[in-house]
Amino acid sequence: MAAAMTFCRLLNRCGEAARSLPLGARCFGVRVSPTGEKVTHTGQVYDDKDYRRIRFVGRQKEVNENFAIDLIAEQPVSEVETRVIACDGGGGALGHPKVYINLDKETKTGTCGYCGLQFRQHHH
């Protein structure tokens, strides 16, 4: 149940500005909770009386503001000639298992399930 709540929280839109966005759109970047604490990429934020805040006594909570989902969203869609593309995330130790993406479906754009890179078939 807790995992489902966390996933649902990730899908929520952030702020009033997001109301003008299309239904599937999401806001990216660091959000701030009502207490002024930065929210992590997983939506983690603690209440004022939460016992888990003890780890931040005497120091500030550090949140990396360069979320990977933001960096992937900045990548343009790659145009390829073939109808099946293999994505390995860059290969080697920095990549992920090789997956094959079929680009002749109705979606017209294929997205890698591991790294989020998008591919589109270039028709000539």
Curated annotation (Swiss-Prot):
Gene Ontology, cellular component aspect: mitochondrial inner membrane; mitochondrion; respiratory chain complex I
Keywords annotated in UniProt: Acetylation, Disease variant, Electron transport, Membrane, Mitochondrion, Mitochondrion inner membrane, Primary mitochondrial disease, Respiratory chain, Transit peptide, Transport
Location, primary (coarse class): mitochondrion
Membrane topology (UniProt): Peripheral membrane protein
One example of a Gene Ontology biological process annotation: mesenchymal stem cell proliferation
GO MF annotations in UniProt: electron transfer activity; NADH dehydrogenase (ubiquinone) activity
Organelle transit peptide residues: 1-28
Subcellular location: Mitochondrion inner membrane
Residues recorded with modification N6-acetyllysine: 98
Superkingdom of the source species: Eukaryota
Function of the molecule: Accessory subunit of the mitochondrial membrane respiratory chain NADH dehydrogenase (Complex I), that is believed not to be involved in catalysis. Complex I functions in the transfer of electrons from NADH to the respiratory chain. The immediate electron acceptor for the enzyme is believed to be ubiquinone.
Cited PANTHER family: NADH DEHYDROGENASE [UBIQUINONE] IRON-SULFUR PROTEIN 6, MITOCHONDRIAL (PTHR13156:SF0), NADH-UBIQUINONE OXIDOREDUCTASE 13 KD-A SUBUNIT (PTHR13156)
Clinical note on disease: Mitochondrial complex I deficiency, nuclear type 9: A form of mitochondrial complex I deficiency, the most common biochemical signature of mitochondrial disorders, a group of highly heterogeneous conditions characterized by defective oxidative phosphorylation, which collectively affects 1 in 5-10000 live births. Clinical disorders have variable severity, ranging from lethal neonatal disease to adult-onset neurodegenerative disorders.
Family: Belongs to the complex I NDUFS6 subunit family.
Subunit structure: Mammalian complex I is composed of 45 different subunits. This is a component of the iron-sulfur (IP) fragment of the enzyme.
Protein name: NADH dehydrogenase [ubiquinone] iron-sulfur protein 6, mitochondrial
Gene (UniProt): NDUFS6
